[in-house]
């Protein structure tokens, strides 16, 4: 299947966090058959464990397959419970002891280099108890600065993702953080279209335009305004056609990957319906 959207400069992909009941090779086979042209690879169980002694070799093998398929790849780092079996997404970059998170992100950068990834996507985390926003921002700037240096050395850009409920919640927050760091070339933005429904004051079009040329990665899903819950297209309030039109107007050339991490029970069906919805929205833009 040729796949893709006719005339689009960006590639459609799918997130592996929506295929956690499939071995990674099988997920790739399914997505290729459905017409996707890239993958957002979430590191950790069950697909590519960055702390496994064979991870580099596995990444090199994956790189060969992606190259054969002509696929784009981005690295996602939102694995639940990878670093702490009791606390989701902890430690984060705001915690007192963030060493394990920083190690994980350095491994993500290294694996991204092996895979030829467009970028490594990351986020701030929620504000820990008893840490002031000012102190948390100081920690984030200091720790992110070191990761930006690592990304520059590896030749793999970082893409910072604003997340509802986190310290860095909006595109404006992410742009301010980048400015605080001196606007490094190796630090761009990830924008999740569904998040825009929840937290962006100017909606999805305004958020994408604000990110503009700094946009390195796009996650595609629907949401309702009141809840940070990833939904299939048509089950939320996202104007998908307007979002795709804006990406086209911005001449976005990266990956736009569907992110539905709670839908693995019907992954092939969800991926097929998502492709159909994307094709219809593209035609309607």
Predicted feature locations:
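A short acidic, helix-capping loop that chelates divalent metal ions and anchors anionic groups
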Residues: 46-50, 83-87, 93, 128-133, ...
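Histidine-acidic metal/acid-base catalytic patches
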Residues: 1-13, 20-37, 60, 67, ...
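Glycine-rich, proline-tolerant flexible connector loops at the mouths of alpha/beta enzymes
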Residues: 42-63, 124-128
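Active-site acidic/histidine proton-transfer and metal-coordination neighborhood
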Residues: 25-26, 67-68, 72, 82-188
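Active-site beta-loop-alpha junctions enriched in small/polar residues
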Residues: 15-19, 42-46, 78-80, 125-127, ...
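Flexible, glycine- and charge-enriched loops at secondary-structure boundaries
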Residues: 52-59, 94-98, 130-137, 167, ...
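Alpha/beta catalytic barrel-like cores
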Residues: 20-31, 42-45, 87-91
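Short, conserved active-site loops that position catalytic residues or coordinate cofactors/metal ions
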Residues: 34-48, 75-86
């Amino acid at each position: 299947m040729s796949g893709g959207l006719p005339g689009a400069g960006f590639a459609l992909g799918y997130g592996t966090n929506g295929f956690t009941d499939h071995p990674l090779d099988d997920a790739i086979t399914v997505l290729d058959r459905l017409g996707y042209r890239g993958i957002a690879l979430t590191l950790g169980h069950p697909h590519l464990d960055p702390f496994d002694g064979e991870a580099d070799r596995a990444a090199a093998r994956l790189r060969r397959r992606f190259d054969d398929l002509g696929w784009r790849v981005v690295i996602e780092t939102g694995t639940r419970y990878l670093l702490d079996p009791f606390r989701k997404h902890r430690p984060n970059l705001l915690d007192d002891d963030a060493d394990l998170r920083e190690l994980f992100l350095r491994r993500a950068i290294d694996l991204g280099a092996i895979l030829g990834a467009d970028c490594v996507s990351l986020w701030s985390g929620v504000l820990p108890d008893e840490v002031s926003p000012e102190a948390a921002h100081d920690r984030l700037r200091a720790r992110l600065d070191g990761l930006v240096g690592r990304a520059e050395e590896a030749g793999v850009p970082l893409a910072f993702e604003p997340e509802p409920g986190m310290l860095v919640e909006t595109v404006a927050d992410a742009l301010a953080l980048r400015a605080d760091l001196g606007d490094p070339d190796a630090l761009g933005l990830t924008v999740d279209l569904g998040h825009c429904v929840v937290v962006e004051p100017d909606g999805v079009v305004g958020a994408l335009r604000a990110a503009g040329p700094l946009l390195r990665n796009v996650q595609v899903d629907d949401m309702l305004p009141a809840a940070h819950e990833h939904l299939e297209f048509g089950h939320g309030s996202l104007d998908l056609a307007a979002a795709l039109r804006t990406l086209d107007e911005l001449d976005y050339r990266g990956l736009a990957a569907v992110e539905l991490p709670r839908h693995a029970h019907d992954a092939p069906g969800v991926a097929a319906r998502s492709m159909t919805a994307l094709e219809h929205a593209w035609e309607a833009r």
